[in-house]
Amino acid sequence: MDRTLIQEILEVVEQAAIASAHLTGLGKKDEADAAAVEAMRKRMGQIQMQGRIVIGEGERDEAPMLYIGEEVGSGSGPGVDFAVDPCEGTNLCANNQRGSMAVLAASDRGGLFNAPDFYMKKLAAPPSAKGKVDIRKSATENINILSQCLGLAVSELTIVVMDRARHKGLISEIRATGARVQPISDGDVQAAIACGFAGTGTHCLMGIGAAPEGVISAAAMRALGGHFQGQLVYDPAIAQTSEWADYTKEGNIARLNEMGITDVDKIYEAEELASGKNVVFAGSGITDGLLFHGVKFEPDCTRTSSLVISTLDNTARFTNTVHIKDGAKSIALS
């Protein structure tokens, strides 16, 4: 991987974001996702690389494009593995709510954990708390550690939690410490990454979300030097989701074993979920969010706001791009 490839990866998420943004607020989440998938795959196909999707839209028989194992790119050049979520927060996009984005993680071949389509308990925190907070500890313990690491009173901390029934006890425990809870309906990738930047007002992500998105979050947090841990959730009683209504704990363990995951209780560090020598995170806002603005359509241009984080040169680049339309007469400065 090199800087030219990183620039092209940025353009991949920009094009996906623009495609979804045309459907923002129309209540068409599936169509918005499909548009992002098509745009992402098209741009990937123009890159000189031997790309492979390791986390995507589903298994080959479940998804027409960007399925797990699909080869993308020109077929020549460096081998690159991708974990993609072309429209993270499809409901947010459909309802024109904050936090939807096109996002991916990339690494050298074999550098990303091929997470199963399971749930994952997650803990994300700032670099100053790395290795000090721990997913094995209670929320109360971790909040007190965060307070010490950040030099903030517990009452000044904001903890992001997915607004799900399974988190009722977690939310109660957090509030009992005096810390503030920020519930979100979808899109925990952006919330996790926001923990890695000072000034976002987001200090920690706790709770259970999707495992594939956990790998993307881990890639970003590894590159930022932030804290991220994940642990697969296989017990339907803990996940508390209608999607697993017909699943059993024993059946889920068997599924994981079939995938080669024998230590089903393993706690994964960011460096294990994104283990490659070169790791890149790229995200582009579809709607406004914690880290960047959404796509803005203007008469003569389209504006995107994006973030690329890379271990290649240890940088986090916030990029505002003006995509000039044919025949443009006047481009406003901002």
Swiss-Prot record:
GO CC terms: cytosol
Binding locations of Mn(2+) 2: D85, E88, E213
Metal-binding among keywords: yes
First and last residue of the signal peptide: none
Residues that coordinate or bind Mn(2+) 1: D33, E57
Any Gene Ontology biological process: gluconeogenesis
UniProt KW keywords: Calvin cycle, Carbohydrate metabolism, Hydrolase, Manganese, Metal-binding
Keyword Cytoplasm: no
Listed EC numbers: 3.1.3.11, 3.1.3.37
Gene Ontology MF terms in the entry: fructose 1,6-bisphosphate 1-phosphatase activity; metal ion binding; sedoheptulose-bisphosphatase activity
InterPro entries tied to this protein: FBPase_class-2/SBPase
The protein's role, per its UniProt record: Catalyzes the hydrolysis of fructose 1,6-bisphosphate (Fru 1,6-P2) and sedoheptulose 1,7-bisphosphate (Sed 1,7-P2) to fructose 6-phosphate and sedoheptulose 7-phosphate, respectively.
Entry protein name: D-fructose 1,6-bisphosphatase class 2/sedoheptulose 1,7-bisphosphatase
Originating organism: Prochlorococcus marinus (strain MIT 9313)
